[in-house]
Design a protein with these regions (language model features):
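Conserved DEDDh/DEDDy metal-dependent 3′-5′ exonuclease domain
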Residues: 4-31, 36-131
Length: 131
């Protein structure tokens, strides 16, 4: 079993620009967000968790006010974007860029297409597939 890479904690615009630059041309990128949607008109993005074949990162969306470089990366410069139940994530992306990722693999949708419970939490899908 291969060792997982160390994760990067990204808290500044400079770190974000450097990180996004290092991911350009990646064949795949998986991400998930944490946000607060209670008592607000639009959800407030707090954290973006990112994984590629050889990088892991946590992007502090509270410290970094403009995540446009990340959203532009997934729209223009990576292959497949892997997500789970990404409705809100793609609203963040669309608001920042006016576009969506070209190649999308949504685990929740795929689970539904192959006859699994829909909608289903990520943990539910993993438990059903791995026992």
């Amino acid at each position: 079993m291969s060792k997982l890479p160390e994760y990067e904690q990204i808290t500044t615009d400079e770190q974000l620009a450097r990180f996004c630059g290092s991911l350009r041309g990646s064949d795949l990128l998986a991400f998930d967000t944490e946000f607060v949607s209670e008592n607000c008109y639009r959800p407030q993005l707090c954290l973006v968790q990112v994984a590629t074949r050889n990088k892991l990162a946590l992007i502090d969306a509270i410290s970094i006010k403009d995540l446009t470089p990340f959203w532009e990366l997934i729209v223009n410069d990576v292959g497949v974007t892997i997500v789970h139940a990404a409705r809100e994530e793609f609203l963040f992306c669309f608001r920042a860029t006016g576009a969506r990722p070209k190649e999308l693999f949504d685990l929740q949708l795929v689970g539904g297409f192959i006859g699994m419970e829909y909608p289903a939490a990520y943990t539910t899908l993993v438990n059903q597939l791995t026992g």
